[in-house]
């Protein structure tokens, strides 16, 4: 299963993926926020993270955004849960779940309860494919892209 990453900005994103115009439009409209975009990866991303594509987003949580800005490089960012289990929203539950498997848990306060991010696959240049619908609706994504394409004509 590919490991998603967070990036600080478009410049950082372009260092690790081939960011097409469709992706740039979605980044401009919806990010920072709960939208993850899959794009063809560049060779700087190891195959151990993902083989052909990379899913990335710009986080809206101030601590996550500060961490990736200060690191100066993308950071892997999986959800705070075990696969196929519900997400964890408190550091206490994360500690109980992961105490034997991680070296550090950063307490950034209680996380907002929301669905996991929307995931859009833009690896094929033709059209976006919604992999998972979350807080950013498929309808709003398609509407934004239609408006943009109408402007370009």
Regions found by a protein language model. Name each.
Residues 1-153:
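Active-site-adjacent structural elements in enzyme catalytic cores
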